[in-house]
Amino acid sequence: MNSKLLSALLLCATPLLGQEVHMKSVTEKIPTYQIGAPEIDPIFFTGRVYQGAEGYIYPYPLYDVLTEKQVQQDYNVLRLDNQYVDIAILPEIGGRIFAASDKTNDYPFFYTQTGVKPALIGMLGAWLSGGVEWNIPDHHRASSYMPINWTMKENEDGSKTIWVGETELRHRLKWSVGVSVYPNRSWVEAKIKVINPTPMIQSMLYWANVSVHCNDQYQVIFPPDVQFGADHHKVYFTNWPIGEANLGSGENDDLSWWKNFTGNSRSIFAWGSEMSFLAGYDYGKDAGTVHVANRHVVPGKKFFLWGNNANGEMWNKILSDNDGHYLELMVGGYSDNQPDYSWINPGEIREFSQIWYPVKGIKGVKNATNDAAVNFEPTEGNNYRVGYCATTLYENARVVVKYKDRIIMDRRINIDPDKYFLEQVSVPDPSDPSTL
């Protein structure tokens, strides 16, 4: 398919009036499995390897004692919402986004735990799945299950921001993430800032670990220009999307579907994409999650899953009592693989941003920007599906589809996050892909 077949000119954005962003800090009880007290003596480096890097933790303690004692624990929950989205952040558990939902259809576009059930996965041991985990300067970073600093800010444009951050004690890097919700927009924005205040060059890694609910009808959507996927360290490559879901089986499956990973857990990184989005879609719920960021700064696109197998069921029980399977749609800054560290110079400041938003009703995603997600795909016969889900109100927007030099669809529509566009268009001769 080439640029001769164009769809979608969304024009004339019209802001809604009188819509506010709400921000508050509240105390909420969440069922929590307690962890035991850490080792009181310092633990120095013993040659341990963690996530492909040196696994030293000093001066942090090791939280490796789990218990089966569950209590109703009070948490400080930081909440942001507007008419479209509602999110919750837990500064006492690493500043992660704990929950996010689309208010127009109640779809949780991040995996939302109904409780806190840690497992021994993090750098310091205890670790929580779900939501969005900020991994700086290492994967499943040291303070992922620890309290970190936070503050709230109201901005002149009407948006509101919850900032979380810390000075990391091993590298002495300072980092902060500002999570914002805007009036009249369905996106959640994260602004990331990493500073090296030390006189020495330091290594750093950034990956946002985004979890989503998944099932037999869930599909990972890499950009359509992706033809290859890589495993960790880039030591193994696979064709995309058709390849061995279960390594060593000798059988090819569609790697984009969670249901096909019946053998074991798996990570696959998108290789060589020139596009700036990543998505996932639940066809049973006809809804999904989209991420957009500058691909030159945030090139990493990856998914991880425990799998549709006994191993996956085991990890479900380890990490959650009631919330089911999840899949991680990770995105990496300054990195397209793990572990893939970059160097940050003395005094260097790195800043970038990324957004996520829910989509619905369009049966998949073929491209996405900050303004909208589009689906354009063949259905039956000569028909193509044309779908748009916008992140704000567009009045009298124009949808245009061209076949060669001829317009075959020209529509004026009103569209917003609560009102998607989905129609069929007939293409005169779809048999030759070079004409599309």
Predicted regions and their residues:
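Mature N-terminal, pre-catalytic/accessory segment of carbohydrate-active enzymes
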Residues: 19-67, 71-81, 85, 93-95, ...
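A contiguous, surface-exposed recognition patch within enzymatic or periplasmic domains that forms
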Residues: 26-38, 42-43, 78-80, 85-99, ...
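Extended, loop-rich substrate-binding clefts of extracytoplasmic carbohydrate-active enzymes
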Residues: 44-72, 77-81, 128-186, 216, ...
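Asparagine-centered strand-capping/turn motif at beta-strand->loop junctions
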Residues: 193-200, 388-390
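Surface beta-strand/loop "capping" patches
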Residues: 361-394
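Beta-strand-rich binding/interaction modules
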Residues: 383-412
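Short, aromatic- and glycine-rich surface loops/edge beta-strands on solvent-exposed regions
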Residues: 399-400, 431-436
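Aromatic sugar-binding surface patches on proteins
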Residues: 415-430
